Amino acid sequence: MNHWLAFLNKPESLKEQNSDCDQQGEMRHVTDGTLTKSPESKPFRERRSQTWIDSEVPTSTEKSNVQESISSDIISKLSNRRSRRNRSESWAGSEASSPSGNISTLENATEKNTLKSPNKFLQRGGLPTVGIGSQALSPAGKPSTLGNVSPGKFTTYKVHNSIEVNRFSSTPTKLLTNPHKVAAISNDEHYVVSNESLEENIEVAHLENVFRSSKTPDEEQSEYMKLGEIRLSSSSYGGSISKENSLPKVLDELQSQNEEIKALRQKLEEKDDRIQELEELNSMNDAKLQRIEDLQKEFHNERKAASKRLNIVQDRFRKEIKKIREEKITDFQNKNASKKEKNEVTSAKTKCKAFSQRNILVSELYRKQKQILNLQQENDKFLKDINESNNSIVKLRSEVEILKSNLQLSQDENKKLHDNGSFYEKRLNDVYSYMQNLSLFEKDLGKFILEEMKCGHSPSMFQNGFAKLYPDFQDIKNLENMEQYKQLKGKIELLEKNDRIRLEKIISVFKLINERLHFMQQQHSHKIKYLQKEALTKEQQFRLEKRRWHDILNLKEENFQKLKSELKEKLILSEKIQKNAEDKLNDYMNEHQEIVEKLQNQALIASRWSTQIQESENTHKKITDELAGKQSEILKLEETILSLKEDVFQEKLNLKKLYGDPSTELNFETVGKSFPHITKEKYDSLGLDILTDLTYVQSQNLIKNLLIVLDIPLKTFLKIVPTIVIQLRCELTLLTKFANDLNLKVFGKQLDFKSRRKVAMNEFLNNHDIAEVKHPLEYDLQALFKYFFS
């Protein structure tokens, strides 16, 4: 029964297993490229069983975990939004703090702004130390060469008319400026915008120090009065600029929204990875995931378009604000200062701007250097990991070679045993042919001896049986032949004894050899299968590891090359900026006279810019409306994610129902309780572990085939199986033995059950109907029946 069932089910099961293995390999290839690692080197069925085991958690705990994860995500989003709003408000507050009163307020404002600025370096006199003085340090820790101000410029103080003045010991020399250079829009743009009030404070302080070093004590009083008026006007102007500088808040909110969108995209990708593992169980999830991916692509494209629009609007706003600010400053200077004061103010302004721009460039260069160092460290780590992986690959190869050598040895041993068995079979065939051809006095003595051995008669009965078959030998009784007869009889008895002993030995040895060969063949076949599986799994592991490390190295090299090229571009830009600033300093002095004549025309242009600002505000409102629509889309996506989570949870419950209770699963321990006579060797020989590798459909097909062939309903199957086993193991053996012995007594030969069973098996395979099978044994039994009752 087992033979023909295996014959029926083997091709389909092998095909399905091969297809499953191919799908598993494809799944591994897809998932291990996240490089996640792979996940693992385990087969898919083991990972599937692990997911089943993980899904055995009670439903209440899973629901609570899902609710807790959702609530924690919402809380983290709210906290991130609040922290970003507080940060933007703090920056706006620092921008609104304009200089008024005395220099102490300037120092406090600079301390607040420098604490929050991206240039986290040491400070001297409330100003960043980068580029100030010969002893100032660069971000890399080396002496700065960006300016040649003496060390004592920010050390002496003087109180005059209750105004604390940070007095310079000497005037600064040429500073590199580039006022028309527009900084590239980046994530740190709000730092630059927020430090505009700081630049105004630095300008005023620098003007005071210059006037105190260049004017006489009599002229200082009038100059201080003028500077006081300048401060009051600049404080009012700073308040108006702080209102205009509300754009960084919008930028911060947009950046926070972009970060939230990125976080949502990352979460969606994680959910996609989880859902991909359940693709084999539910095909409906594939369609839902495809919809989500399409929505993500559309949302990503729209977000890119919105970010481009925002960048364009930001550029316009920054340019317009800078132009309006320059126009108002020039108008104010024309009304309240002379031409010399204007020149000094503009030069101080350009120097301060150049100073701030150079600080920003230096900070960016320092940040890029840190990124390059980090990338180099990561590259070293990856090289170490690659060396370790190469060592592991070498070990795996050596293990594969050892396994191959063991497999070859086992195959050689199997061949030797097969050759020995064939040799003994030849010897037995030779002895059998010799006994069949043995004749004495033209009588078949050898055939008679073989039949007596088959019947199991004792040697003492040989003479009687021989005399019955050959009565002619009884007349030989003369004296001359009696002696020869006795001698021949003694020799024949000795030969018979020797032949019997030899035959018994040969038969016993042949049985032992057959049993040993069968046992060794089973062992070697199991070993060969196990070694082949191990070799395949290790080769797959090696290929996956090799692909994963190759992809990681390519990504890291690409990132390293990109950062390297960006650094080179930044260095080239910084050198160009320095050269252009030195050239433009001389050009600005010549162009100043022409700018004074053009100021009157700029007043008319200011009205035009105001209208353009209104238009830009309208566009900004449109963009905010678009962002609100995007937020509604994000909420819809979150709802779809929650529905997908519920679907995944329901699929896990369905999987749990399909898998059943693992505590009721049969293994060697549970089988030993109900069948104590079964040993571990017997349990392993039955091959029950193969059933764990079968799919749900394969296991159903196996049970259905059994029920159809046996023609037993499922309700009574477990009750009837013991009776079938008793019929096969006990009753069938007794009946076959009885029929065989009866046929031997009647016809002098045994029944050949194997050949008749093969004929019946071929008929069943052709028809697949047990009722139409005509067993050849029926004819033999009818012959026996006729012999006794006819």
Curated annotation (Swiss-Prot):
Subcellular localization, as worded in the UniProt entry: Prospore membrane; Cytoplasm, Cytoskeleton, Microtubule organizing center, Spindle pole body
Superkingdom, natural source: Eukaryota
GO MF assignments: chromatin binding
UniProt keyword annotations, A-Z: Cell cycle, Cell division, Coiled coil, Cytoplasm, Cytoskeleton, Meiosis, Membrane, Phosphoprotein, Sporulation
Post-translational modification remark: Phosphorylated.
Coiled-coil residues: 241-328, 361-430, 477-498, 540-658
One BP term from GO: cell division
Chief location: membrane
GO cellular component, one term: condensin complex
Bias (Polar residues): 50-78, 89-108
Residue ranges, annotated region (Disordered): 8-122
Disulfide pattern: none
Biased composition (Basic and acidic residues): 39-49
Signal sequence segment: none
Job description of the protein: Involved in the pathway that organizes the prospore membrane (PSM) during sporulation. Mediates the assembly of the DON1 ring structure at the leading edge of PSM during meiosis II. May constitute a physical link between SSP1-containing PSM precursors and the spindle pole body (SPB) and may facilitate the recruitment of other factors that are required to promote spore wall formation.
Known partners and oligomeric status: Interacts directly with SSP1. Probable component of a SPB complex composed of ADY3, SSP1, DON1, MPC54, SPO21/MPC70, NUD1 and CNM67.
Name of the featured protein: Accumulates dyads protein 3
Species of the source: Saccharomyces cerevisiae (strain ATCC 204508 / S288c) (Baker's yeast)
